[in-house]
């Protein structure tokens, strides 16, 4: 293999791998231009490859997206959740650094809609269970406090114990 054939083979392998990812992958340069992106990235933003070679801002102009891009091109890791077409998309961006200079960024996009929905359901369920348990526990605690405080005649204690039991 010559050097050119080897480079071409490696490029094809990289394209094959990234095209088979569920996650969106975008590579940008230090000027925000899209150098490479897989089809999952285009699908998540609901665009076609017309943005290849253009600024990453052609995908989304939202303030939090712009801040994340500015942060990563400033040399820092950025992570946000975007709302895209009704879905929650986690954006994870890491700078590409050569020496001390940021040359661009690699952006990973993961659809976390179902994960966030499950977390919300779990939180809601926990809150409901907590509320449902607190109501009878408050009654039990109240009856026990009345008995302990000596406000109940000895012959009425079995009646209160029956209420607590029920």
Predicted features, each with a name:
Residues 1-16, 114-118:
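Short, charged amphipathic alpha-helical "coupling" segments at sensory-output junctions
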Residues 19, 127-131:
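Conserved phosphoacceptor histidine of two-component systems
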Residues 49-114:
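PAS-family sensory/regulatory modules and their coupling/dimerization elements
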Residues 116-127:
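Sensory-domain boundary/capping and coupling elements
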Residues 133-145:
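Short post-phosphohistidine helix in the DHp/HisKA domain of histidine kinases
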Residues 148-155:
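Short acidic helix/loop segment immediately C-terminal to the autophosphorylated histidine
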């Amino acid at each position: 293999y010559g050097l050119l054939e080897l480079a071409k083979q490696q490029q094809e392998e990289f394209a094959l791998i990234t095209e088979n990812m569920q996650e969106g992958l975008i590579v940008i340069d230090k000027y925000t231009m899209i150098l490479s992106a897989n089809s999952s990235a285009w699908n998540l933003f609901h665009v076609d490859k017309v943005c290849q070679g253009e600024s990453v801002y052609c995908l989304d102009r939202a303030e939090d997206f712009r801040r994340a891009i500015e942060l990563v091109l400033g040399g820092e890791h950025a992570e946000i959740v975007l709302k895209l077409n009704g879905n929650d998309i986690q954006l994870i961006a890491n700078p590409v650094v050569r020496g001390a200079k940021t040359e661009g960024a690699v952006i990973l996009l993961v659809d976390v809609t179902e994960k966030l929905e499950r977390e919300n359901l779990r939180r809601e369920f926990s809150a409901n269970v907590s509320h449902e348990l607190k109501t009878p526990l408050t009654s039990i605690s109240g009856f026990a406090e009345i008995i302990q405080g000596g406000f109940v005649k000895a012959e009425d204690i079995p009646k209160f114990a029956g209420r607590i039991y029920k």
